[in-house]
């Protein structure tokens, strides 16, 4: 996938937005060619320097940017020259999907192995042991808690797990 096409993909845009947030999105969405300083980016994008630096470090922590330090011989100050590494985005998304699949499988197992009770007034859910300790009464409002059917939730998880496994080409 070409670099420009990658940034046009709504999934990639959402991923970057989740990483850097709304203040960092201009930094993530408009990476320059070659090296650039944080000051240059802040000036070009009209952003606060701290917001640019925060976004750059988040991108760095996620292997989407690298930097090299150059010391000014006159002042002794360090300048950081940043390069964007968006070719790592597909791999990062794959890792996120793998983590999501693992979490869903674990959660599905938890849902199947436990019996739940619900306070319909407060919408608080309790495991059987906790409900029993509470005398099957909600500690918030005193209403009786009722056995909760979670088949729809498990079915939705099954569907999502199946779709993720299909997208990732992973077998059960």
UniProtKB/Swiss-Prot annotation:
GO biological process entries: regulation of DNA-templated transcription; transcription initiation at RNA polymerase II promoter
Question: What sequence ranges are listed for the domain HTH TFE/IIEalpha-type?
Answer: 8-90
Q: Name one Pfam family in it.
A: TFIIE_alpha
> Which GO MF term does the entry hold, naming one?
DNA binding
Q: Does the keyword Mitochondrion apply?
A: no
Keywords from the named record: DNA-binding, Transcription, Transcription regulation
Residue spans crossing the bilayer: none
Q: Report the SUPFAM superfamilies cross-referenced here.
A: Winged helix' DNA-binding domain
Q: What does this protein do?
A: Transcription factor that plays a role in the activation of archaeal genes transcribed by RNA polymerase. Facilitates transcription initiation by enhancing TATA-box recognition by TATA-box-binding protein (Tbp), and transcription factor B (Tfb) and RNA polymerase recruitment. Not absolutely required for transcription in vitro, but particularly important in cases where Tbp or Tfb function is not optimal. It dynamically alters the nucleic acid-binding properties of RNA polymerases by stabilizing the initiation complex and destabilizing elongation complexes.
Question: To which protein family does this belong?
Answer: Belongs to the TFE family.
Binding partners and assembly: Monomer. Interaction with RNA polymerase subunits RpoF and RpoE is necessary for Tfe stimulatory transcription activity. Able to interact with Tbp and RNA polymerase in the absence of DNA promoter. Interacts both with the preinitiation and elongation complexes.
Record's comment describing the protein's domains: The winged helix domain is involved in binding to DNA in the preinitiation complex.
Q: What is this protein identified as?
A: Transcription factor E
Question: From which organism does this entry originate?
Answer: Halobacterium salinarum (strain ATCC 700922 / JCM 11081 / NRC-1)
Species classification: Archaea, Methanobacteriati, Methanobacteriota, Stenosarchaea group, Halobacteria
